[in-house]
Design a protein with these regions (language model features):
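A conserved short coil-to-beta-strand element within the FAD-binding core of flavoproteins
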Residues: 187-202
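Glycine-rich FAD pyrophosphate-binding loop
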Residues: 35-56
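Core beta-strand elements of the Rossmann-like FAD/NAD(P) dinucleotide-binding domain
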Residues: 14-16, 211-221
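Extreme N-terminal leader/targeting segments of oxidoreductases
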Residues: 1-18, 33-37
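Flavin (primarily FAD) binding-site architecture
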Residues: 224-239
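Dinucleotide-binding Rossmann-like beta1-alpha1 core, especially the glycine-rich loop
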Residues: 59-145
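C-terminal catalytic lobe of FAD-dependent flavoproteins
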Residues: 177, 235, 240-286, 292-365
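Helix-loop-beta segment of a Rossmann-like dinucleotide-binding subdomain
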Residues: 143-182, 203-205, 213-217, 290-299, ...
Length: 365
């Protein structure tokens, strides 16, 4: 991986087969794939690699259990396949990780539906290559695994498997792999314009945020992998505002592991038909996430008091003697999911929007 100054010098004098705008996990993956096939590739990122949504996750490589409720079976199976592939190809980055979904008293129908859903999830997982299966837990076993859960609230639970990773480390590993294949990567470079020649993007107009200098990069094709900033880059070509991406805000809070005693990660159903994760991470607990339409500054999403209170209330609904308060919160972070809004969809209802990837072939490719 060469120095930034050398990468800048190369960018000024070369014509690349592909310029990738965006240094998150999507841009890194595109660059790695293209470079491994022999293309000359340049990745441009306006801040740190992985600084956006890619570093604001719940650290999970999950198969999309909650997507089954929306009947997204094909997506769930695809996610399970990708999860198993990552575990096989990058065991130093992705490892098996188990969760417990508690069953609540007086909610027999939901408990049965959840058990059936996890059974289907296991079936999809097995067809994707995993051999493990879920396990039903009685109240005593669940109490030993997660003492903070109230025995008057929960009646047992079910244990299932997913995977976990360090999201930022994952991005940097893929970036470095792309470099090993010959890609050039530069951070702190802002894209200010896209020049067209014969109906195709031929130059990317850039601004070095360190030196303040402007320069252009010649290319044969360009990929916009900027997540929630997708529309900003697309509009550099079209010249007119067009909304393809709807940002959905996901907030997490962090509390000390001593504040809520659990020896396992939890997958908590909520009263508003969502799910909240409680994930042990680096001697602390991450609790999240929310899923709400966002209209604020996409460059600096912050957790709000209402969002933190919501997450606290979900966890507290499962406990009695280990109730959490704002005083227990040692940190928080928020990220924005770039969801594709299809014609006729309600932008406010982000939880119903598909998590599938779509590729738009814009004028100027």
């Amino acid at each position: 991986m060469q120095s930034r100054s050398q990468s800048l010098a190369d960018a000024r004098k070369r014509k690349y087969d592909l310029v990738v705008i965006g240094g998150g996990i999507t841009g890194a993956g595109v660059a790695q794939n293209a470079a491994s096939r022999g293309l000359s590739v340049l990745v441009i990122e306006k801040t740190d690699f992985g600084a956006g949504t890619s570093s604001k996750t719940t650290k999970l490589i999950h198969g999309g259990l909650r997507y089954l409720e929306q009947f997204h079976f094909a997506l769930t199976r695809q996610l399970c396949e990708e999860r198993e592939r990552l575990k096989r190809l990058a065991p130093h980055l992705v490892r098996d990780f188990s969760f417990v979904l508690p069953f609540t008293r007086g909610n027999l129908f939901f408990n049965m539906k959840a058990a059936a859903g996890i059974g289907l999830y296991d079936l999809l997982t097995m067809t994707a290559g995993r051999t493990g299966s879920h396990a039903h837990l009685n109240k005593k076993t669940l109490s030993q695994m997660s003492p903070a859960l109230s025995s008057t609230v929960v009646s047992g639970g079910i244990k299932f498997h997913d995977a976990i990773t360090d999201d930022t480390r994952m991005v940097l590993s893929v970036i470095k792999s792309a470099c090993d294949y010959g890609a050039t990567v530069i951070n702190y470079v802002q894209v200010n314009g896209l020049k067209m020649t014969d109906g195709r993007i031929s130059e990317v107009e850039c601004h070095d945020r360190f030196s303040g200098e402007d320069f252009s990069v010649a290319c044969r094709a360009c990929v916009n992998a900027t997540g929630v900033w997708t529309d900003e880059i697309c509009n550099l070509v079209s010249g007119s505002p067009e909304q393809r991406v709807t940002p959905s805000k996901g907030t997490h809070i962090v509390v000390p592991s001593s504040a809520f005693e659990t020896n396992t990660a939890l997958f908590l159903p909520t009263k508003d038909r969502r799910f909240v994760f409680v994930v042990p991470w680096l001697r602390a607990l991450m609790i999240g996430t929310t899923d709400d339409f966002y209209t604020g500054n996409i460059n600096h999403p912050l957790a709000t008091a209402d969002e933190m209170d919501y997450l606290l209330s979900v966890v507290n609904s499962y406990t009695e003697s280990h109730r959490l308060s704002r005083r227990d919160i040692t940190g928080s972070f928020a990220g924005l999911r770039p969801l594709v809004r299809l014609p006729g969809q309600d932008a406010d209802n982000t939880s119903s929007m598909s998590r599938e990837h779509l590729i738009f072939e814009a004028p100027g490719k």
